[in-house]
Amino acid sequence: DYTTICDAGLVRQALTNLLQNAKDSLQEHHVAAPAIRISMASEDDMIAITLADNGPGFPEMDLGKLLEPYVTTRQKGTGLGLAIVSKIMEDHGGNMQLGKADGGGALVCLKFPIHTTTRNGKII
C-alpha cells in the first residue's frame, strides 16, 4: 500500500475535468464504441493515475502548450481545464503528462509523490 497527501476536493475536480474532456471528445468525434480506461500504479517514488480513451487523441502539436491557460483546440473550449489540472498537480508536488494511448487515443497521467509511514504512524 502507498500513501499520498492530497486535497480530495481538488483531486476530484482534476479527475472530473479530465473525464469530462474525454467524454466530450468521444462524443464530438462520434466514436462508435467510446471507452475511457482508468488505472493506478506506483512508479519509483510516485503514484500514477492514468486515464486513456479511444478517441482521436491530442492534436499534433507541442502537448506542453495545452497546459497553458487559454490554449484550446476545441470550438467551445475555454482553454482552462488542463491548465487547472496542471496547477492542481503542481500544488500537490506532482505533475501531469499528456501522450498517446495504445490505439491512438488521448492519455493523461497524473503523478503524486508517495509518502511513507513510520512505525508510529506518522507520514513523512
Per-segment meaning from a language model:
Residues 58-69:
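Short conserved segment of the HATPase_c
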Residues 11-12:
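A residue-level detector for a conserved hydrophobic packing site
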Residues 3-6, 73:
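Conserved micro-motifs of the catalytic ATP-binding
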